[in-house]
Regions:
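Short amphipathic alpha-helix starts
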Residues: 1-11, 26
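Short, basic amphipathic alpha-helical segments that act as recognition/interaction helices
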Residues: 16-39
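Short intrinsically disordered coil segments
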Residues: 11-15, 164
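Short, positively charged interaction helices/loops
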Residues: 31-62
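Charged, low-complexity intrinsically disordered regulatory/assembly segments
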Residues: 103-205
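Amphipathic, interaction-prone secondary-structure segments
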Residues: 57-107
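Residue-level signal for alpha-helical context at structural boundaries
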Residues: 25, 39-40, 44, 187, ...
Length: 205
């Protein structure tokens, strides 16, 4: 009981809850990895990879299972798209989810983005799903496109491995989305670019 009280007091002074402080002790002194530490390592690596591009602005809170990457569209009033990486809901088949969130009152932009999301699903069903050995269960809601992040098979993954795969995927999606919306890329151009990128990927997510 005395130990618990001391831990609670220390956690209070550090502005933390008891479980978070215990996890920190495990990581720093016993070298036991925790989900929070792994999420943090992945997000720090993504932040480092994304910062030089300036196309996507990363943000995450230490210990959080989610990270957001904000991108501005070349469209009237400069609407933004937010890519939310959520690693808290992974299972044996997935690492988590990628949520693509957009807010706009423009019916034309909503229609164009919906068209792109449907095109993306068609391309991945045709090109990626056979390589993964399973379908990709995407969902489109009002202002949100949700895509599960597949768990790569056959190897132990470091935080840098995961960060590299997620960063490359988000950058590809963002680049092709913008090209499709500004008219510089047709549906066939998007598919061709996707296929070319797929051939160079070391991890399939």
């Amino acid at each position: 009981d005395d130990v618990v009280r001391e831990v609670d007091a220390l956690a209070h002074r550090m502005g933390m809850i008891r479980s978070a402080l215990v996890n920190q002790f495990l990581v720093e002194y016993v070298f036991v990895s925790t989900p929070e530490r792994r999420w943090n390592d992945i997000f720090e690596a993504i932040e480092e990879l994304m910062t030089p591009t300036r196309e996507l602005v990363p943000f995450f809170a230490p210990g959080s299972s989610t990270m957001s990457l904000k991108s501005s569209l070349s469209y009237k009033y400069r609407p933004t798209v937010k890519y939310e990486v959520d690693l808290s809901n992974g299972d044996a088949q997935t690492m988590g989810t990628l949520n693509i969130v957009f807010r706009t009152q423009s019916a034309a932009l909503i229609s164009a983005m919906t068209s792109f999301f449907r095109l993306w699903v068609q391309i991945e069903d045709k090109c990626l799903a056979p390589l993964l050995g399973s379908s990709i269960s995407c969902a489109l809601y009002d202002g949100r496109f949700v895509r599960p992040l597949a768990m790569p098979r056959g190897k132990a993954l470091t935080a840098d491995d995961v960060a590299g795969a997620i960063s490359a995927y988000v950058q590809l999606f963002d680049r092709l989305l913008k090209g499709y919306l500004d008219g510089s890329l047709s549906a066939s151009d998007v598919e061709m670019a996707y296929r070319g990128d797929l051939r160079s990927r070391t991890l399939l997510i």
